[in-house]
């Protein structure tokens, strides 16, 4: 009898310990799981959005979220406890916490299963992040076997359904990596960790596994079982998509690169002569000159300022160009004249600016003095060019201070290139380089968000009467709030590559970011020897152009020596031109 009483008392004490460790909070619940030494919190941001965080201690780590700008609302929560579970309901969803294992289950208000964590599916493995102690953090879920998943940004696999694969989510040219998935069931999960992350889906589990982090941190979004509802939740959580200027919705012509103001304006003239609508034209790189002067944000190339032959300016001639070449007397002699000519002819001008600087530039020298350069190899290689640190607010201030010179010149739109940023020969030292917010590794995928944020916020501070238009090569969750559209990077001119962009663009858009496009015709024309007279190349260009009509932004582009203006493919009456 005495032993029986002791056992009963022991069970009561253990049950009591678990009960004491589960706390109902103003916005959800908090649970300390003794067997795992893990604290988990459920925090409702609205009826549609709930945040789940877990960390291996009793003390909440300090963590910044770059995409999330919403503050939690007051949500009417209904609590129910039974059989070791705590159920919390809002008007749109039910979240169930297993108080012993910490497993979280998500249901709709009718009690139908949406998705659930795998039991004991949160893992923390101690590791080093440069000089800091950190963890490899993973979270595993269990999806329905026949469920389709979308999202993950813009990949180059050609897969629309993201099941049955493993992907390393680390931004690079042609791959935009967003740790967000959305289901045909009408829910979305955003894994809030910007370090390189492996997404894996097998018949047994679906998981996110990040290189470094101090907590498992994700947001579950569910409204009415539709993608409209999920995307509304994304915009509520991370910011509304800005309205782009009306003129951005027309046709854009771009080439790598127009090599003088006359060359750019002659392309505009030809479109006007042919009666082909053209709303925008793009000035690509090297208007600043040579690689050492990379991204000076000034017109210093002597061909742009009528200084060919002037010894003081010839040192800025782009690498590989002939200093003895003879050119006719320019019709348009200054950048200001070029901008005014474009505007006079009812078009708009976009210009290329990068997230890196050459050692001759004033920006490089100032950023170096404030330890705001990331000193790893980037494009162009072997030129001493380095990316800046957009996580440093003072570096973003400096970036705009120089960019404003081009804004004051009348430039209409920004091509913020290489916002991954480009990187080569990366090892432990390079990924461990410090930023203002920790190691480069720990914040890597958020680089494009912060870099575009700097341009957007500074220009809006100067004038809120002019809408922004930023074309950028990389992106992150929430980037729709910064007036930017992403293109799919420097892809090659091939049918299979074109096909892959379709799935990439759809999955990117399902991450809540509506503005996206490709280089119409592809960037690298190697497959056809950069020959626009090749009939096979013309066929590809025509089909891509037809698809381009349905992209959010219609922009023709190619790499030198290819030329892709439509009149290069023939005259009126020739099938490729007429199509």
Predicted features along the sequence, with ranges:
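Broad, structure-driven detector of short, well-ordered beta-strand segments within folded domains
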Residues: 40-44, 93-99, 189-191
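Bacterial Sec-dependent N-terminal signal peptides
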Residues: 1-22
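Hydrophobic or amphipathic alpha-helical targeting/insertion segments
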Residues: 89-116
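Generic recognition of long tandem-repeat/solenoid scaffolds
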Residues: 29-35, 52, 84-91, 104-107, ...
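A low-complexity, Ser/Thr/Gly/Pro-enriched, surface-exposed linker/loop concept
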Residues: 21-22, 28, 43-87, 125-127
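Catalytic-domain carbohydrate-binding cleft regions of carbohydrate-active enzymes
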Residues: 112-579
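Noncatalytic nucleic-acid binding interfaces
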Residues: 20, 34-38
């Amino acid at each position: 009898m005495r032993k029986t009483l002791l056992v009963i008392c022991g069970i009561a004490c253990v049950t009591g310990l678990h009960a004491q460790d589960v706390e109902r909070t103003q916005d959800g619940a908090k649970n300390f799981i003794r067997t795992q030494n893990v604290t988990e919190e459920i925090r409702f941001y609205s009826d549609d959005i709930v945040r789940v965080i877990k960390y291996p201690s009793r003390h909440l780590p300090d963590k910044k979220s770059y995409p999330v700008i919403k503050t939690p609302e007051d949500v009417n929560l209904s609590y129910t406890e039974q059989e070791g579970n705590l159920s919390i309901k809002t008007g749109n969803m039910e979240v169930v916490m297993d108080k012993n294992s910490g497993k979280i289950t998500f249901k709709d208000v009718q009690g139908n299963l949406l998705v659930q964590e795998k039991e004991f599916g949160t893992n923390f493995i101690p590791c080093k992040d440069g000089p800091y102690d950190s963890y490899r953090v993973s979270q595993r879920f269990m999806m329905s076997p026949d469920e389709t998943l979308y999202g993950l940004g813009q990949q180059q696999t050609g897969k629309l359904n993201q099941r049955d694969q493993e992907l390393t989510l680390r931004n690079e040219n042609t791959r935009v990596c967003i740790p967000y998935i959305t289901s045909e069931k009408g829910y979305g999960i955003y894994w809030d960790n910007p370090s390189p992350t492996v997404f894996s889906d097998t018949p047994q589990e679906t998981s996110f596994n990040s290189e470094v982090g101090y907590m498992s941190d994700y947001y579950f979004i569910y409204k009415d079982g539709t993608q409209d509802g999920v995307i509304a939740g994304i915009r509520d959580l991370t910011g509304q998509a800005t309205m782009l200027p009306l003129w951005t919705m027309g046709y854009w012509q771009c080439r790598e690169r127009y090599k003088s103001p006359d060359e750019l304006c002659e392309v505009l003239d030809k479109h006007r002569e042919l009666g082909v609508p053209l709303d925008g034209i793009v000035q690509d790189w090297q208007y600043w000159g040579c690689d050492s002067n990379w991204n000076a944000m000034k017109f210093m190339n002597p061909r742009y300022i009528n200084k060919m032959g002037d010894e003081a300016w010839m040192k800025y001639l782009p690498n590989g160009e002939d200093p003895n070449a003879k050119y006719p007397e320019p019709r348009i002699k200054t950048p200001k004249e070029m901008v005014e000519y474009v505007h006079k002819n009812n078009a708009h001008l976009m210009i290329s600016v990068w997230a890196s600087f050459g050692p001759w530039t004033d920006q490089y020298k100032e950023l170096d003095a404030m330890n705001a350069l990331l000193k790893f190899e980037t494009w162009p290689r072997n030129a001493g060019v380095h990316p800046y640190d957009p996580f440093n607010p003072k570096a973003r201030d400096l970036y705009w201070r120089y960019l404003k010179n081009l804004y004051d010149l009348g430039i209409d739109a920004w091509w913020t290139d290489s916002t991954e940023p480009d990187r080569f020969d990366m090892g432990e030292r390079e990924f461990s380089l410090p930023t203002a917010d920790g190691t480069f590794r720990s914040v890597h995928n958020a680089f494009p968000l912060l870099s575009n944020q700097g341009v957007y916020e500074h220009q809006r501070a100067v004038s809120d009467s002019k809408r922004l238009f930023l074309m950028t090569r990389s992106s992150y969750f929430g980037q729709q709030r910064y007036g930017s559209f992403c293109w799919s990077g420097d892809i090659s001119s091939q049918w299979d590559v074109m096909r892959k962009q379709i799935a990439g663009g759809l999955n990117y858009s399902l991450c809540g970011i509506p503005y996206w496009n490709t280089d119409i015709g592809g960037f690298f024309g190697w497959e056809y020897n950069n020959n626009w007279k090749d009939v096979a190349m013309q066929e590809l260009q025509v089909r891509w152009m037809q698809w381009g009509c349905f992209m959010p932004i219609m922009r023709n582009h190619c790499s030198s020596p290819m030329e892709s203006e439509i009149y290069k493919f023939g005259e009126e009456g020739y099938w490729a031109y007429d199509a």
